Amino acid sequence: MAILKHPKVDALETSLSEQLKRDLSDQELFSFAPFDEEEAEQTGASNYSYWRSTLHAFSKNKVAMFLLVLMLSIVIFTFIQPMLPGQYDAFAVNNGANGLPLKNKQPSAEHWLGTNSIGQDLWARLWSGTRTSLFIGLTCALIEAAVGILMGVLWGYVRKLDVLFTEIYNVLDNIPSTIILILVSFILKPGVGTIIFAMSITGWIGMARFIRNQILIIRDRDYNIASRCLGTSTWRIIVKNLLPYLVSVIMLRVALSIPGAIGSEVFITYIGLGLPATVPSLGNLINEGRKLMMSPNLRYQLIYPTVILSIVTISFYMIGNAFSDAADPKNHI
């Protein structure tokens, strides 16, 4: 007697048979890996590096890279220029064959950028002045950054110090920094140390307030609260959790404070309270060139230091912005 099957039963059996064949074929594609106890003990680690990623992102900015190379070339040349052959002393007065000073001589093969009003070589004084101004700018920027970051972190993170630091800030911030700069430069003996001290007295205030505001934003985030609950020390939280997040903005502020300090040196020297006239600096060179600005044949004495000052200012600004963008953790994957 023939057994009749429902068409749906036949379809189901066919489907199950095909599924079984597929499962068997899939099993043939795979095999168990042998167990290696030594490899099992090894742990994987990411090859990601924050600074490598930052430098890679920064190197993509061609303009910033060009300006960085230009600035490094200027800085290096300012230090090696006195050691090159055939260079004049920046402080020496050059006399002619008749024994008289070579005053305001036009650029020539002997004096590449000419001489100033007392016969000093402008090429030598330009690079010596650039070296002095860069030293002042870098030193002031580092002092302002060190003091400002320390005070700003404590101000923003330690709640008990908030009232005290706020009062200190209100007192110092209400005194115009220009007046302090002028008074200190007038009272103390003119010199590089005096300029640096005068600009550092109040220069850290802006950095401290900026860091304090940034710390307040990230102070009570979950990972910082968790660190405090686990008993992590305040110093470790500041160093490991807070400051790395602020690297980009700190670098930008430092990069901008360097031309700012150089500009302050130029200003204070321009009004006659800065470095002595015998000490070459961009401020002194611009002040000397200003007096000759109305003489068409001598305007070059103002143009040279102004061009160097412009290059330094623009370069630090562009480099600081580019590095800030590259170092921003938000831009890292």
Model-derived regions, located:
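Glycine-rich helix-loop "coupling/hinge" segments at transmembrane-helix boundaries
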Residues: 185-189, 214-215, 263-308
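Transmembrane alpha-helices
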Residues: 131-147, 235-267, 316
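Gly/Trp-centered helix-boundary motif
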Residues: 2-149, 153, 160, 174, ...
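Hydrophobic core positions of alpha-helical segments in small-molecule transporters
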Residues: 66-70, 136-140, 168, 181, ...
